[in-house]
Amino acid sequence: MKFSKVASFAFLALSSQAALIQHDVIIENIKRDAVLAGSAENNIASSAFTKRESEVDSSEDVQLEKRISFAGIVSSIINQLPSIIQIIGNIIKAGLVKRDDIDDAFALVLAEYPHIVSVFEDAFGDFTEAKRDEAASVGTQILGSFPSILTQVVNGFSKVLDFANSDTFSTGLSILSNFTSIASSFASSLSSVVQNGKRDGVEDIVSMVVRQIPDLIVEASTPFVTNAEKMKRDADVAASLVDNLVKKGLSTAIDTFGAATVASVVSKRQVSSFLSKVLSKA
């Protein structure tokens, strides 16, 4: 498998690894794999999660997020950003990733979305929706609806790709380069939907919002995708792409879903196992 597959998942994998290694309560049972980054002459390697040295009984397989600090996980991920940027930067400078590899990575990520969503659905399957008359029900219901939210987000961007009069890679790059503006427009529309729902006395606002996510994404993204110039396919764009993914991806996810939810995703055993399999097969 091409090196681009490793690069596609490098950020989330490294972040997950750093968070788990730093905050797992049974820290002595984890081998701390090293992630090395060097010049063109050095070997550049990334490692996935290793198996625990001692088997953990299935009855003790409690949710990891209950044994860790959400704030600590987010902090550890942020602390790893300089190293992650250095690793990816060295890979690009060393010529190990070419423009075609970036394109392949885009196609791969799009193709893997259904699988990723199914993994997240399994990871969050144990969450249940709270009663609507409870004070904190909306927040809990949003967390319980996260698999549906993820699916609708994927559907929304799929519609954008179908609608755009451009190739998949250029469309993806246009979305990334304008992601801040798109996210702002989406958030504004989402706020309007919520306010209108409250005004109209809608009982289940969360479900109503989830149903409208694809259309809201299309509405927010289409102006940027259809009017943007076709982005150049060169090394500068590749570097800019990685920079946008690292800097905007994490901050947008935390701003949109909250630090606790993002921490929950990267801390779930199923997600970690999936990433480990992807990297080990590369």
From Swiss-Prot:
It is found in: Secreted. Induction: Expression is not markedly induced by human epithelial cells. The lineage of its organism: Eukaryota, Fungi, Dikarya, Ascomycota, Saccharomycotina. It comes from Candida tropicalis (strain ATCC MYA-3404 / T1) (Yeast). The chain crosses the membrane at residues 68-92. One of its GO terms (molecular function) is toxin activity. One of its GO terms (biological process) is symbiont-mediated cytolysis of host cell. The N-terminal alpha-helix of peptide ECE1-III allows insertion of the toxin into host epithelial cells membranes. It comes from the Eukaryota. The keyword Protease does not apply. Its main location: secreted. GO terms for cellular component: extracellular region; host cell plasma membrane; membrane. Secreted protein cleaved by KEX2 in 8 similar peptides (ECE1-I to ECE1-VIII). Stimulates biofilm formation. This is Extent of cell elongation protein 1. Keywords: Cleavage on pair of basic residues, Host cell membrane, Host membrane, Membrane, Secreted, Signal, Toxin, Transmembrane, Transmembrane helix. Residues 1-18 form the signal peptide.
